[in-house]
């Protein structure tokens, strides 16, 4: 067997003919139906006799006495008084036969040359056959005789008859009618002559043909040579014939045939027949007698030429008939000529082995065979239609329009169809066209285009068939009566009498009318263009010159004819998809029956009633039933079926509705359905030279080869077949869809074409172009999904994530470009056995109003049919659903109570328990006034921060909540229309004064930014009007950010840190955010006495004082990563009603943001410390209005199901700090209710912001702040103040232990504590989801839906835990946490809290704090533990996520959807960086900001996108300023954190990348292993921030974090040795995340030493540059730059890569090294859209990041969690302009400790920046433009535009979430246009406002981090 590979032009060369073993053909054929005597001699003479005159039939003649229907064959039939004339004929071989018979109207026509007229009868009378009087027109019969010397296969008249058409007679089968009436008189019938032509039979013996020779000798594996091939080469048999001497050799006859295999695979044959002399000596006596060579009497041998026929044939899977004809003719010519330098064998092997297959790149191959012989091999026309050898022009030319339409009807109704012709080359092309014209149906019955005589028995088969035969067959056989015979030579259809009424008029009228009209038009064109090919005779022996224009014209006509039939089929089947019935439940035995798959009755009712019979018959045919099956299941026809659906869509856009067909068809006329590939128009031609003759060495003459006839071929002279032949592809390129995972996401050619057209159309429309690019990015993710799922565990969760992304796409109005997204998920559901999810995907498509095409629908049904279904429906899913419904109903009834409860409550310490969630490990515990007692006496787990949550709720968020339109009247202070305000906070709040807005807390401060929350709680909170949604949408991505003001950072900080700052200080330090807070804080001061725990802003100010500097950075970060807590808050924000003064309405129930819990921890810890210092400061912070009231005073969380419980604010006393079971108080009702409302499956990961109280630190150990190193310029850099009393801190922060970030030593904790930690993680889990609640937890658990979770062991855990909940709810949390440990895993990692209010973003920690200022706010435990690690699902650190500030909402994207779909990694936009980095082994900073090569301007991401073209091969973008093209680059920088002491890798079972979220193993021991304090020294040193702030290395922070984390994990997993922490620390199943630069607490505290801290000298965040490596960290890998590809280009390249290398390439270590461009672009886009991915895991083990050594891949999903990817908007590296950007200056200026120390230049810069900030707050952009333009030096070329300077400064200084970029753009545009001309002259092109296209790109994708 020869190994196969690649499409071959031809497969086999065969010689067939008479062999020694051939048997007589007569023995092979059943002769029962043969004619009486076999072939007849040709007619040599005809005569007319007048019987009425007494003339008789001449001797040797036969008289035609009767017509076919037995009427008298009188030529004057029916005439009165006319003579009776009859026709007579004579047969014989004694002279040349007649070749034609005609009729001449004398006087009107001239006699044709070569014809003779019968003017007289044999008896001398006039032979006028007209029945009229003698004076009228005379009519004579004429004939033409063959020449004396003629070829053997020339045709002759073999029969003749007369028909009377007026009596209903028609020409008999195979007879040709002379279309001239013989009777022109008034009386008489219409009489016509008919005659039959055939090849005159000679004396011959027919044998069954055999195989004489084949090449190659061995079979191909995929295509063994069929033994029946010789029969098709010589369908009439191999004959020995005796010819008359005057007969000459005929030219070779070309024929084609098709072999259909059992798999319906077609093989095309092209053959040439010719005759050769046959030696008389080889004949036996019997043969001599049969041939008439041996006289019977004398036994004498007559000398006559004896010949036999032979055939040479090529077999191929491709119908290159014309090329094969040319090649075979060349071979034949060589075989009868000579001498030649090369043998025939060389030419054959050269053609078969050295001719490349035509491809789109080289569509034409010119093959030079010799000096005179050449021909072109053209690529097959590539359309989605099945490949065939159809010749539609031949069909139409030979049958005409009406007969074509009738034939179409016959085929559709599955008749027995017999095609016949004397031209064998015509048969195959026409038969192929007949089968192709019913597309999308496929003929299911026997199909033999050229049937050998030996197989003719099929004509008697009792089933439909399409068979083609040589017309000579009818010389031997009569056709069966029920067969429809179609004579291609005479253009006639012969239908049995009982079916005479069948014709084209039975087709539906309008489609048929359109069909016939078009066919008639094309028929006329064909007649003018068509060259009659010499198919029946030989091919021209002259050199062949390709007639391109004729070929092109014919190809065009061919496609138009095919398109006409396609249009007809589309019009009769339109709307059929609406009647397909998908399988939506476990399949039964009848699931695959046609009636189960298709609503036949519904379909019939929708059709034209007048043609119900036609449709009824059609719907019962095998072709229709098979069509329905193919539409319902995967088949190799899927591509064609999808194309057909597209055709219907084009012709009848409203498929489901029957519109008037007339309109449809008229409009359809102009629609092109089949289009030529671009390659068909290409002139690229490959020239192939003939084989080289052997070199002539001069001595020995090379042999010459001469032939007289075709030789016996010698295998030795052939070139040996090449060993490596490409495997044959059974289907034409692009026509097959395979099941291989690598090609799951492969688009069909039609989908690619459609995408190209759509791209060109969208390119001219800015909003559409942005959406188009955005949609392509999702497609990229789905293309990589098979690889992602393969390396994910569990698979169910990965699949659920995919489903959630589909939901997200719909909710954010992403229009899928094609169905690849859905198709891939469905196929994966089949691969990983999840039919239920496949059903959900199908219904998701329906919800999105997308009708699955054939490919998608086929995969869907295949999955649901073949996959095992869950056995029982009454499972936990069912039961939990009942519980959910009941609880949800109760929750709805309680809504009104909440409102009233809220109004009566004092804000007090909101969020005490309800926010945190009862039973959460971090349950709030009341602290005494001094805040120390609890530390001493309360077990760590109980010392939880009560206010923590409150802090999270940041004022702005709260206010913004109220800003949204609500039924309540809005405060007069709010601005009229927030859309037009750049700053989303009323400017009044930005006063530097402590302006009190007592009554205005409920007024709008920021425009709502929590669309997502909406989604989550929408069901519960119906107070909101729809109007809110629009505004909320704006918040979409960016606003989720954690900026201080918006995301409740304030809240977080407030609790703890607020104790240390006074409001005015804070306001100054924090800028706008603080001011807002300050304003809001004035209310709290009046809070009722009973509220023990209040926090003053003053404390906050401590931290904020200096954090202002960092705030901007934080803001930036925050935009990307608001902590989940914040998110929760935001979400809850929606639930809150506006409140006046202190009575902040809070819907606590809705607020079960467990994320808040995380905050409460941090708060509490802060409080504990701060409380001691400033008990007074513990005043209620009304700023937290946004969150539900925390019932910090609830001692035992009684009545966990009471929603009102959350709203009661009880008095708290110091004594309340006493220990109580925190877990029990978790509000389960809220949790469950929240779950019901939770719509965010993707958020499965939810930010694990656990609220851990601060861990107990050993007295000496400073509360080490795992303070992250500062992030680069675009990243915020926070520094936390030094811890005040580490001891105190330790004590006061029991929860810290569970906080991974926390640094500091912890004392061994009691088991109680240990289990509590666990519960915390649960709470974190819950918290993590933006709307955390149990439900959210559950939801987040696997990104899943309750249904998925509740199966298997997890549900048991949950059930059992529920039982315990009655007694000890905390245990439940423990159980659940472990059951869903994956959530914990990440969760715990991030468990602590989002940074204290804005710490992370706002760098709230101020340098002004003295080292003792208690780390309030930055207590190790709180700070160190960021609430969400990247992995956390709430959007952790999702810098890349589409962050659109309020105005930037991606089109009408329904933000609701966006939230849950967040990938775990980026899932928490609120993610605090500290936690992010705890688990971080590598930080990767990416920026797409590029520099135009021509003008040097900086081109930012959205501008690059807007500049891309619709060409998927063009890598360039267009510079928006100089319009030149350049290649944008993605710049990547790394910060390798693996050397840090606290970082160590540990395998985790998580299946998600950090970004995708982590899923730790489900079972981990929960015992707590104490850690010794030996590591303390390392940690302690970090606490003295004043001294070491700059030097705190990230490693150090790691150490701290790790120790914390380890403790926190309570030894859940295993103990690990750490270099800096000698003791083995127990660690959870997740690796530590490194809390790092993004504004997290890990950042260095002392900015003064590094003014550039917030501003990296590198393009990317400074954190990258922090090389201070106390612990010997490894050096960071060098930066990488790769071309930044458009999603169109990237998709094309990715598809090509997967097709060539398989999908495994995506998760192999070589991917990043071998395909860096594709890799980094995918990483960029997946982060940009916040989609889960395992790609980052490849970075850790890549050669690039390991000094050239490729490390083995351990666990991609695990490794991915260890890589934190940050997408940056700006790239400082590219700034070549002197000075630094304004936003960098602002950061640096604000990082200085004392303004008095600033130089004059710095003070001037500070004044400028401050002026600009204030102007922006007042919506004044003109002033900043003027200020900056005045400072510009005229004539100098700038790189930084005024637009970017002002925008970036606004975002950084005022808080990203507070800036509506869209409003800013509007204001900037107005200001720019209002500038006087002289001012405009000073400006440069780069200063112009962005174009609409740029704005839309940013709206869709959001803005990266700045």
Swiss-Prot record:
Positions where Phosphothreonine occurs in the chain: 966, 973
Keyword Protein transport: yes
Start-end of Low complexity biased regions: 1423-1437
Domain dDENN residue range list: 522-640
Location of region: Disordered: 904-942, 963-984, 1154-1184, 1246-1317, 1410-1440, 1548-1577, 1596-1628
Biased composition (Polar residues): 904-917, 1154-1171, 1292-1302, 1548-1564, 1611-1628
Listed Basic and acidic residues bias regions: 920-939, 1281-1291
Subcellular location as annotated: Cytoplasmic vesicle membrane; Cell membrane; Cytoplasm, Cytosol
Boundaries of every uDENN domain copy: 191-363
Main location: membrane
cDENN domain location: 384-520
Keywords: Cell membrane, Cytoplasm, Cytoplasmic vesicle, Guanine-nucleotide releasing factor, Membrane, Phosphoprotein, Protein transport, Transport
Domain of life: Eukaryota
Domain called MABP: residue spans: 40-199
Protein name (record): DENN domain-containing protein 4C
Gene: Dennd4c
Compositionally biased tracts (Pro residues): 966-975
